[in-house]
């Protein structure tokens, strides 16, 4: 084994030299230079600095503007709330630990931080799945005349929490465990060991299958069908110029959504699966640290892609920031244009970016 396993940790560093210490008690500067830990702390501070205002504005603007309180926006609010889980429940802990070079909050703190980080990430992921299903059902119309209503939105939000709990809660009750990962300043599910005492192998397989592979397949299927439907409608010239413009925006949004999802999560999932499948192989702490910390940036990507690129929401946000005035456009003009689009057979409420 090229790492050192303890009762509640796994350090990716051989202990032949006798320098490995518990990441809950001693600085881990034998894994990386002190300045590298400082870089991690600065990075986490940046995520907090950017993630809090964007996600807070998302919640605040929706409360301020009644026209934004639509069923679909319930899912978007859920997404912003999930990001707050990570920004408040995980990021400050990781930043403070990085400043000290080890996980200073002990094993209990590790479980709390790991739970919040996993919970927030999974709520966000399953929110994207609900959005994908909604777009597919409304635009592709596998069920004729289906209208996404408030009850559907509430059910969707409930599903995201149930699925997130089904992933984040088991390690708290003995199925797998949360341990420090990478440079030992943040916690996640144990991909490093089989740990038969907590049936770790079965949980990791369950997590990758149910909480990563299946959501990814659903997202790709729904948005793949969405793109095909939009292209077919444009080719048949069944829609007005305004609607075709909305369709192009959907195509652009779909590409951004899929690429952002891949950029945020696939590197982390791939490295985690590699480590799990090749236990005992030689890899450094940076190997897991970089994708793990990069995945945390989804707390910023998500609101930018799913909220800010929504024209109506963007106008409302600008109006709120500018104390009731929008210096860049006229809300009424935008609303009129939206109404015209909604009059077509494929309405903007059906095809505009969520």
Curated annotation (Swiss-Prot):
Please spell out the taxonomic lineage of the organism that makes this protein.
Eukaryota, Metazoa, Chordata, Craniata, Vertebrata
Q: Specify the superkingdom.
A: Eukaryota
Alphabetic keyword roster: Cell projection, Chromophore, Disulfide bond, G-protein coupled receptor, Glycoprotein, Lipoprotein, Membrane, Palmitate, Phosphoprotein, Photoreceptor protein, Receptor, Retinal protein, Sensory transduction, Transducer, Transmembrane, Transmembrane helix, Vision
Membrane topology term reads: Multi-pass membrane protein
> Which GO terms fall under biological process for this protein?
absorption of visible light; G protein-coupled opsin signaling pathway; visual perception
N6-(retinylidene)lysine, modified sites: 296
- Write the protein's name: Rhodopsin
The chain's Extracellular topological domains, given as residue ranges, are 1-36, 97-110, 174-202, 275-286
User: How is it modified post-translationally?
Assistant: Contains one covalently linked retinal chromophore. Upon light absorption, the covalently bound 11-cis-retinal is converted to all-trans-retinal. After hydrolysis of the Schiff base and release of the covalently bound all-trans-retinal, active rhodopsin is regenerated by binding of a fresh molecule of 11-cis-retinal.
A GO molecular function for this record?
G protein-coupled photoreceptor activity
What residue ranges are annotated as transmembrane?
37-61, 74-96, 111-133, 153-173, 203-224, 253-274, 287-308
Q: According to its UniProt entry, what is the function of this protein?
A: Photoreceptor required for image-forming vision at low light intensity. Required for photoreceptor cell viability after birth. Light-induced isomerization of 11-cis to all-trans retinal triggers a conformational change that activates signaling via G-proteins. Subsequent receptor phosphorylation mediates displacement of the bound G-protein alpha subunit by arrestin and terminates signaling.
Lipid modification (S-palmitoyl cysteine), residues: 322-323
What InterPro entries does UniProt report for this protein, alphabetically? Answer: GPCR_opsins, GPCR_Rhodpsn, GPCR_Rhodpsn_7TM, Opsin, Retinal_BS, Rhodopsin, Rhodopsin_N
Q: What's the gene? A: RHO
Q: Where is the composition biased (Low complexity)?
A: 334-354
